[in-house]
Amino acid sequence: MRLRKTRKIVVSMKDMAASGGYYIASSADKIFALSGTITGSIGVLQWLRYQRAFGSLGVKMRTYKEGKYKDSLSLFRDSTPEEDEMIQKMLSDTYNEFVQDVAKGRNQTVKSVQNLAEGRIYSGQDAFRNKLVDEIGGRKEALEELSRLCQYDGEIPLYEEEESPFDRLFMMLGSKMNSFSSERIFFREFKNSPVLVILPQAIR
């Protein structure tokens, strides 16, 4: 929101801009999304526990810590009722701040954003109908809008993040793992996992 006081910000969403991605985008002057973009997810994220999987492989995890709650979000053990209560309080505060920031960025009421939140995901078209994004379009349309807002007739330079070696390797492996794609593994693991975490943390 501070950047909007000194410059124009236009967001172009591609395949996915959900949860933290939408949190960041919500402060822009204008948001463009593709019809099939996955966005929204103002709310919850499931948290995986790996202790059973590691146990089946004969792997045991030992934790050394200083502080009673230092490993409260450990992936390798179940949380205690006391930890659940503490974490839920923190997450509720984070969730409320998330909703309030989106409402402020999108110039909507908190109640209207709450009605769209609770972790729901939306396609680009659904997000447009619910005023979570401003226009259906891609990078070309977003750049045209940025030029208009800035009253700039020249060519806008593009700076794209270079893929890391890990990203390239992951893409190569993904193309050869049709039946074991990352998406299938991701959703299979999440299917029976408890909802423990609301993301993202507040962005300052």
UniProtKB/Swiss-Prot annotation:
Active site: S19, K70
Swiss-Prot/TrEMBL GO biological process terms: proteolysis
Alphabetized UniProt keyword annotations: Hydrolase, Protease, Serine protease, Signal
Protein purpose: Possible protease. May be involved in export of periplasmic flagella proteins.
Record bears the keyword Protease: yes
Assigned protein family: Belongs to the peptidase S49 family.
InterPro entries according to UniProt: ClpP/crotonase-like_dom_sf, Pept_S49_SppA, Peptidase_S49, S49_SppA_C
Documented EC number(s): 3.4.21.-
Keyword Signal: yes
Domain of life according to the entry: Bacteria
Gene designation per UniProt: pfaP
Signal peptide, first to last residue: 1-27
Pfam families, sorted: Peptidase_S49
Listed name of the protein: Putative peptidase PfaP
Gene3D superfamilies assigned: 2-enoyl-CoA Hydratase, Chain A, domain 1 (3.90.226.10), 6.20.330.10
Gene Ontology MF annotations: serine-type peptidase activity
